[in-house]
Amino acid sequence: MDIRIEKTRQSIINAFIELRSHKELERITIKELCEKAQINKSTFYAHYQDIYHLSDTLETEVVVSIMENLTHPERVLDDTAFFSRELFMGFLAKDSLIGILFSGSRSKCLVQKIEAALKELVFGAYPQYRDDKDINIMLTYILYGC
C-alpha cells in the first residue's frame, strides 16, 4: 500500500479516536474530523462512506485483532475456562480502544461482533455444530460470562 494513503488513513483514525473519546459518535461531524485530521472532506470520502462506516471499520478491526490473538481457538469447546481467560486477555489488550469505540450507543455492538466472530471461528472449524442449539447457547454463555 502507498505510504501516503496509509499515513492519511492513520491521520483519520487518530483524529476520530481523539474526537470519539470526548463525544458520542452521532455528534461527530465529517467537517470537524477533517479539520482535526488536516485533510479535505473529499479525502475522507475516498477512504470511508461516512462516519459510521469509519466507526464500524475500526470496531471490526478491534474484534479481528482480539480473535487473531487467541492462541488456541480450537479449545473453546474443550476447555472453556482456558478459552474464557484468553478472550478476557484479548479484551484487556484492547481495553482503552474498546472503551472509546464501544461507548454510548455502540456499547452493545462489541458483544454482538465478538459473538458473531466467535461463532464463525467455531463453525468454520466444526461445521457440524452450526445447527446445534446447545453449542450455540454454550458459546453465548462463554462470551457473556467473560
Language model features with spans:
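Basic, helix-initiating cap at the start of DNA-binding domains
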Residues: 1-19, 23
